[in-house]
């Protein structure tokens, strides 16, 4: 009959004789129109065994509906929230979280038996019920095809736009192999190296009408599960479920019954599909923006996106609810299709239109991209992200650093006028909104090439100095977002001993190493050091948390054997390998060599190959109370003049990138340059000390 309906079961518990309201897509369980005796007499069953698999490469609603054999009208009912699906049909609710994510789905379908009620209308007596008398049903189930569906949904990690198509193609090729992959006796999946590499980055989600002992979550799990599906359906389809149903108009069996007056125009259905698909796509874009690591670190932008998500989700639910309310009325002939068109038109003319929301998300994504281009420069350095002014104050005031340098994103706004418009529109009837404000991007800071370039230049300068001050105990570097209308894009704040000194800090130009006169200028680069117990010679003792060393020629220390230990000379390295710019001070007394060395310096040679200053691995300033100060490298020695012979505090300044290590006599807040070695360093250097060489006494304290 032309008014018969054919539809997928979608995990709903259809039985022969069950009543159905096609206006509301609602099953009416607990009652059979024909009764058990009549059903028994006129029911026929025919085996209809088949199986197939199919690849679904798209995540669109249209592709999913096609995979589930859903016609346009039922599809709109599902999107509008009228149909509650179960079993394998829950696949319809599984959408990608991100736009930049590849998804490929393997569908397995098996059919087992076809059952039908064979008595024509008018030849059997039907049971009366208040359901039919009150017009609560329009159709009755007359045939059911049983079987089972299974969907293996494989998702890649979030990828860059440029890699999306390539990953998608490789995923399709790999997923197509699942039905043909063999599992050896060890139950391991045999894959090529390339397939293993791809599979390791895929996640799997299973939606099916099969009862599994455990759900597959990986590609390998999916392969193993797929192999078992034919047996899980049971002998003679014992475990199969309704897959497809045929429904006859109830009026054919009961003249008092209501009927479906009209189905919705296909073009109208497509417009509703498009509208709801657009909403889901916009939602995914917001999800993707929210998941950016940098967004999680910056509450100003995180809260803005979160606020949008809440408003937009409420709006989506409102649209779905309106569609769900109108569909039954249109199908019953109570309202015209124009009521559905009005939902589409209202959205197109509202602040929630696809054009306006897309424009706002474009601006958010641009803003995030600019922030990432700056923040990415300091990723992996010691610069610390703080979430707000309170946390920054805590770090600056309570922290141990004397100098705090802060890269501030100044133009990330807390209040967004467009979000206020969205909120007002959703909460109030459209007629009460005086005007519709579209999101503005023309004058937004992140679209200004000049502003962005200045931000990136400032970020690069900040990054360079973060690297220069690596391991400095007196300087801290921080990143955050604080609104400040005085500066577009970004600025650098400087705090000195807990107080804000300037909101527009410029790093001072460094003098030549000979030009340093004030100790405070070098203390910016001060770092903490400790002696390395694995390198210390057995004739040196350690104390004060490994910061004080003394020669012990009359008492051998019982250090454990270690390949890094110096054997032939009274020497020790520090634990810290240094690159960048660093300053440290020592108090020395007696016979001492102070400098730097590569970790690769020999340890056990009895000649001078392992002695500091006698090879290409080390650079030292030596103090001998009898003859004074000597700089030594590669066995070459030169006397060094000191302004006050016998001074007790020595400062060392390393500029690794510039290739220099400088020595200073320290007195109060003044330093006097003694000597600078110039070279090209090829690996990290370690503070190095020789304490009491050749049987002499010496002590040294790290400050």
UniProtKB/Swiss-Prot annotation:
Residues 508-703 form the B30.2/SPRY domain. The keyword Cell division does not apply. It is found in: Secreted. Keywords: Cytolysis, Disulfide bond, Hemolysis, Hemostasis impairing toxin, Ion channel impairing toxin, Myotoxin, Neurotoxin, Platelet aggregation activating toxin, Potassium channel impairing toxin, Secreted, Toxin. Residues 386-517 are annotated as: Thioredoxin (THX) domain. One of its GO terms (molecular function) is potassium channel regulator activity. PROSITE patterns: B302_SPRY. Residues 2-265 are annotated as: Structural MACPF/CDC pore-forming domain. Coiled coil: none annotated. One of its GO terms (cellular component) is extracellular region. One of its GO terms (biological process) is killing of cells of another organism. It comes from the Eukaryota. Expressed by the venom gland. The first domain (residues 2-265) is structurally homologous to the membrane attack complex-ferforin/cholesterol-dependent cytolysin (MACPF/CDC) pore-forming domain. It makes numerous contacts with the FAT domain and comprise essentially the core pore-forming machinery. This lethal (towards mammals) heterodimer induces hemolytic activities due to its ability to form pores in the cell membrane. The pore may be composed of 10 SNTX-alpha/beta heterodimers. The toxin elicits potent hypotension which is endothelium-dependent and appears to be mediated by the nitric oxide pathway and activation of potassium channels. In addition, it displays edema-inducing activities, increases vascular permeability. It also shows myotoxic activities and interferes irreversibly with neuromuscular function. Belongs to the SNTX/VTX toxin family. Heterodimer of alpha and beta subunits; non-covalently linked. This is Stonustoxin subunit alpha. It comes from Synanceia horrida.
């Amino acid at each position: 009959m032309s008014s018969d309906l054919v539809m997928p079961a979608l995990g709903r518990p259809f039985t022969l004789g069950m009543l159905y309201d096609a206006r509301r897509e609602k099953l009416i369980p607990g009652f059979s129109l024909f009764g058990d005796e009549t059903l028994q007499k006129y029911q026929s069953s025919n085996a209809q065994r088949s199986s197939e698999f199919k690849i679904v490469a798209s995540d669109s609603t249209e592709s999913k509906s096609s995979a589930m054999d859903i016609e346009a009208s039922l599809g709109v009912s599902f999107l509008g929230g009228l149909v509650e699906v179960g079993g394998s049909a829950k696949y319809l609710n599984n959408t990608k979280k991100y736009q930049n994510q590849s998804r490929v789905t393997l569908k397995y379908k098996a059919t087992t038996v076809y059952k039908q009620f064979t008595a024509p209308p008018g030849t059997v007596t039907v049971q009366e019920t208040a359901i039919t008398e009150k017009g609560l049903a329009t159709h009755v189930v007359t045939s059911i095809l049983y079987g089972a569906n299974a969907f293996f949904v494989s998702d890649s990690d979030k990828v860059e736009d440029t890699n999306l198509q390539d990953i998608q193609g490789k995923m399709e090729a790999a997923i197509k192999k699942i039905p043909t992959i063999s599992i050896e006796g060890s139950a391991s999946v045999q894959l090529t190296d390339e397939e293993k590499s791809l599979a390791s980055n895929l996640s799997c989600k299973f939606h099916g009408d099969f009862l599994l002992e455990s759900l597959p979550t990986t590609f390998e799990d999916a392969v193993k599960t797929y192999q078992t599906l034919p047996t899980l359906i049971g002998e003679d389809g014992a475990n199969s479920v309704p897959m497809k149903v045929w429904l006859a108009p109830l009026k054919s069996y009961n003249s008092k019954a209501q009927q479906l007056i009209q189905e919705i125009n296909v073009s109208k259905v497509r417009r509703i599909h498009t509208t709801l698909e657009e909403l889901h796509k916009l939602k995914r874009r917001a999800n993707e923006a929210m998941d950016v690591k940098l967004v999680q670190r910056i509450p100003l932008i995180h809260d803005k996106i979160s606020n949008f998500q809440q408003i937009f989700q409420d709006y989506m639910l409102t649209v779905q609810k309106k569609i769900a309310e109108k569909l039954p009325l249109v199908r019953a002939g109570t309202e015209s299709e124009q009521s559905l068109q009005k939902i589409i038109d209202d959205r197109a003319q509202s602040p929630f239109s696809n054009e306006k929301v897309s424009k706002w998300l474009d601006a958010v994504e641009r803003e995030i991209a600019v922030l990432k281009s700056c923040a990415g420069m300091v990723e992996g350095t010691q610069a610390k992200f703080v979430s707000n002014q309170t946390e920054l104050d805590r770090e600056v005031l309570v922290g141990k650093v004397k100098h705090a340098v802060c890269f501030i994103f100044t133009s990330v706004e807390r209040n967004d006028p467009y979000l206020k418009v969205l909120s007002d529109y959703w909460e109030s009837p459209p007629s009460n909104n005086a005007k519709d404000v579209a999101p503005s991007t023309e004058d937004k800071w992140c679209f200004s090439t000049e502003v962005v370039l200045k931000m990136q230049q400032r970020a690069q300068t900040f990054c360079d100095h973060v690297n220069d001050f690596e391991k400095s105990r007196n300087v801290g570097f921080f990143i955050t977002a604080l609104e400040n209308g005085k500066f577009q894009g970004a600025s650098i704040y400087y705090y000195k001993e807990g107080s804000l000194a300037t909101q527009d800090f410029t790093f001072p130009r460094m003098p030549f190493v000979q030009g340093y006169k004030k100790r405070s200028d070098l203390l910016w680069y001060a770092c903490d050091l400790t002696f390395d117990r694995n390198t210390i010679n057995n004739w040196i003792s350690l104390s004060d948390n490994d910061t004080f060393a003394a020669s012990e020629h009359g008492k051998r220390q019982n250090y454990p054997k270690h390949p890094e230990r110096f054997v032939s000379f009274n020497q020790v390295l520090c634990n810290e390998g240094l690159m960048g710019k660093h300053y440290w001070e020592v108090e020395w007394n007696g016979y001492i060599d102070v400098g730097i060395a590569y970790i690769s310096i020999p340890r056990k040679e009895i000649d001078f190959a392992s002695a500091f200053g006698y090879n290409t691995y080390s650079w030292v300033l030596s103090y001998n109370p009898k003859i004074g100060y000597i700089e030594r490298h590669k066995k070459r020695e030169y006397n060094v003049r000191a302004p006050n012979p016998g001074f007790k505090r020595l400062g060392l300044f390393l500029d690794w990138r510039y290739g220099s290590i400088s020595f200073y006599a320290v007195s109060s807040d003044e330093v006097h340059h003694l000597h600078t070695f110039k070279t090209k360093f090829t690996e990290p250097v370690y503070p190095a000390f020789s304490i009491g060489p050749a049987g002499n006494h010496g002590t040294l304290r790290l400050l």
